[in-house]
Amino acid sequence: MASLRREIVLAASAERVWSALRDFGAVHERLAPGFVTGTTMESEDVRVVTFFNGSSARETRVGCDDKMRRLAYAILGGRAAHYAASAEVRDDEGGCRFVWTIDVLPDALAPYIDDMMSRGAAAMKKTLEAAPGGP
C-alpha cells in the first residue's frame, strides 16, 4: 500500500480552514476551486467530486471530528482497491498546518494520486490564504 502525505503551512486561521474542510458539499467552492470543479451530494455523507481534468470520484465521509479538526473519507468504487484519506487542521504560529494523508492500493496509482495531491494542495493554499478575514 502506498501512503502519501502533504503538509501545507497556511497563513490562515485554523478555524477558518477547518470550516472550509468540514463543509463536505462545498469543496469546489470553499476548499479547492479550480482543482475540484463540482460536487454533487448523493446523501449527507456521500459526494461525487469532479476534478479539473474531467475525472470524478465517489467519496464517503467516514468521520468528522470538530475537536481534533479532522475529516476522514474514502473513495467508493473506481480504480483503487483501497483508498482511505484524512485531512487535519492544526494550529501553527501565524496560521495553521493542513495535514493530508492518503493510503491507496494498488501502488501503481501512487504517482497519479501524488500529482493530484500536489495540484490540490496548491489550489487549497491559494484559496485559503486569499479568503477574506485574515489569519
State the predicted function of each range.
Residues 10-12, 51, 75, 104:
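Short beta-strand-to-loop capping motifs
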Residues 1-40:
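Hydrophobic ligand-binding cavity/cleft-lining segments
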Residues 16-18, 59, 71, 83, ...:
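Short acidic, gly/pro-rich beta-turn/loop elements at beta-sheet edges
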Residues 25-31, 35-78, 84, 92, ...:
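Glycine-rich portal/gate segments that line the openings of hydrophobic small-molecule binding cavities
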Residues 75-127, 135:
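Beta-strand/loop substructures that line and gate deep hydrophobic ligand-binding cavities in soluble
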Residues 19-26, 66, 118, 122, ...:
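Short, intrinsically disordered, mixed-charge
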